[in-house]
Structure formats: structure tokens, C-alpha cells
Amino acid sequence: MDRIHITGGAPLHGEIPISGAKNAALPLMIASLLTGETVELANVPRLADIASLLRILGNHGVDHMVVGKRPGQTAETGQTIRLTASNVIDTTAPYELVSTMRASFWVIAPLLARFGEARVSMPGGCAIGTRPVDLLLMAMERLGATIEIDGGYVVARTRNGLRGAEIVFPKVTVGGTHVALMAASLAQGTTVIDNAAREPEVVDLAECLSKMGARIEGAGTPRIVVEGVSRLGGARHEVLPDRIETGTYAMAVAMTGGDVILRDTRADLLHSALDVLATTGTEVTALPNGIRVRRNGAGVAAVDVTTDPFPGFPTDLQAQFMALMTKARGQSRIRETIFENRFMHVQELARLGARIRLEGDLAVVDGVERLRGAPVMATDLRASVSLVIAGLAAEGETIINRVYHLDRGFEALEAKLSRCGAQIRRERV
């Protein structure tokens, strides 16, 4: 199992290219099941989760071809993938594949909408709370599906196709909104999705579905209206930049000091996080094709944050921000409102010398003058990268174990950081 070694203390200087968003690419790839024509996706990151989903889609009979990368991308970043679901042979998604990644459960929507049935194993993936699929199944039932649980599998069927309906989510759910959008695109009649997720990744999916022939209005607002169509066609779409990767590297610069341009990204994708970062004393400047992040002199100031659905502070940046606050001047209070059990990184940050106290969904962080390198263990995707950020600023060597979590969500992380001066290397074991 690979390990990452970091010798901290070096400020970051240079440019970091931002990859396409994994959280956008996954539903876009799944949406290829809605049509027998080819869907071409550009700027798809090279990640373990992408490879896992390609295996899952291949199990259904989807053909895929990697056709290249866009100009300016390095050998280890970015790819264009063509997906063709013209010969779907199986509407069952087995446990051994779905258990590797929760998002793969979303195949239930296009399989049900296009073929009238789907048998999908209950999901696996990150161990950060229960993440129940109840809201996703509720959306399917509202559209006329019958749902049964049989031996750990969700079996969804519809006799005469899905029918438009009003779907009111009791709480904001990104996965539920993705599933509802895909299913409603091929449902008969009008579907109204209320309390819809407003995340940029939802908008990206809606834009791709529209290119395929779907009729969608209101994506990016709490109310989305979908007029179902009888069939969808192929399309070409470029995956939007990864706002979580953008915020992660921005916080790394704030942690170490330095001056870095984050290229091929957009400030409007994460205004809340960038505003918080600016409040810490970090200089953040929007550029035509990216964001400049600079911090010189004194360390950052402590700032309180609460995670919220978009456009609020992203839960997927909570662990990274906590790492930054471990060396801040003063006390920071970080409240997690999206997922329970998302403070698993606290114990590992404490091994580096962080002072953090947990009170239910609240983490109270008292900044310390210095962190010291130590062996630590990655527990999930976002927690693992928070340890990287802390290690970049710790005295001595930090060794991060179980870094396969990083490979699920961060493309070429060591290469991007080392080009900016970080002393970071991977040990293959």
C-alpha cells in the first residue's frame, strides 16, 4: 500500500493546472446510459473513481474509448472519453462493482428510465456517515417506479414508463437531484423538482442533458422543471473545473505561504470558500483563466465556518480548512451540517500537534505555533488531503499511509505540488 512522504516548510510558488471535476464527471458518464448514441466528455480527470465507473458501465455493455486530452494538459492529467451505450446487455449493477463507489448507485436512474428496470446493489464508498439512498428512491417512486429491496439489491421497475410528477426533497440532496434529472428527462410529461441542489455539478449535468435533447429549465435554482422527451441523442461536453481541487490548493498556499496561480478554473464556482480564505488574510484574485492565491508574512487569522449546500461553504473543503486553522492566530469554530461522522481527520491532525476539541457537529480549533511531522493514516478522501496540507507546513517529515483515498479524487497531486516547490514523494510499497 503506497505512502506519501512530505518534508514541510517550503512555500509554494508557480502554477497548478486544475483538473475536471470528478463530482461532475461521474454523473455525466452515468448519463451516457440514457442514449444509444455516443456521448463525448472532455476534461475527464484520471482518477481511480473514474476507472471504477468505466468498469461498472462496461459491465452494462457500454463501450468506451479514450481519444486524447485538451491542449495544455500534461501526460498525467485530463482525458477525453467517448461512451456509447448502444448495446446494453445487463441492467444489473453487482455488489462487487457498486461497493467500490457510492455514486455508481446513480445508474439506477438511466437504466430505469430507458429500459424500464434496474437491479442495483446498495452502495459503498467513503465511510463518512450513512448517506442513505432513501431520497433517491423516493424520487424514482414519485415518477412511477416500484421499488423492492431483495438480498442487498434495489430492484426498480416500471410497467409503462416513468411519468412526470412533483418531487419535493425534504432536504437538499445532490445525488437525489442528479437521479431525478436523469430519470425525468425520459419521463412522460412534466417533472418539477423542488428544493433541488444548486451545485455547479448539477448545472453541468443539466447542460449536458440539454445538449442531448432534454428540456430543462431552472438548473442552479431550488426549482427545476423538466419536460420529458421520448429519446435523447449524443453530445459533446467538457467537464467543468474541479472547485474542490481549486479550494484545496488555495488552502495549501494559505498554509505554506507563497504565490500560486490556479489555472483552468473559475472563482464563481466557490465564492464562499474564497471569501472565507480572504478573511484569513490570504490574498485571492480572480483572473480570466484562473485564480491567484498569495500569502506573505504573518500566518492566517482564525475564522469560523459552517458547511452548507451550495452556494455555502462546501463540506468537501471542511477538512482542508480545518488543517489551515490548526496554525491560525486564535480560535476557529467549524460546524459540519451536511454529513455526520466527518471529523475523522481530527485524530490524525492531533498527531501532528493540532489542538482540536469536538462538541457534536462542532470542531473548536485552537491555532498552534508549529506542527511537527509524524506518521498519519488517511481515513477518507477529503481527510487524506487535509493531512497533506498540514504536512506541507509541519516541521520535519510527515508520512501519510493509505493514500489510495487520494487517488480516488486528486489527479497527479504529488506532481502538481512538487512543481511548485513542495518536498513530496510517493513510496510504492
Swiss-Prot record:
Pfam families the record matches: EPSP_synthase
Sequence positions bearing 2-(S-cysteinyl)pyruvic acid O-phosphothioketal: C126
EC number: 2.5.1.7
Catalytic residues identified in the record: C126
Binding site for phosphoenolpyruvate: K22, N23
Keywords, in A-Z order: Cell cycle, Cell division, Cell shape, Cell wall biogenesis/degradation, Cytoplasm, Peptidoglycan synthesis, Pyruvate, Transferase
NCBIfam families: murA (TIGR01072), PRK09369.1 (NF006873)
Function: Cell wall formation. Adds enolpyruvyl to UDP-N-acetylglucosamine.
Family: Belongs to the EPSP synthase family. MurA subfamily.
UniProt protein name: UDP-N-acetylglucosamine 1-carboxyvinyltransferase
Gene that specifies this protein: murA
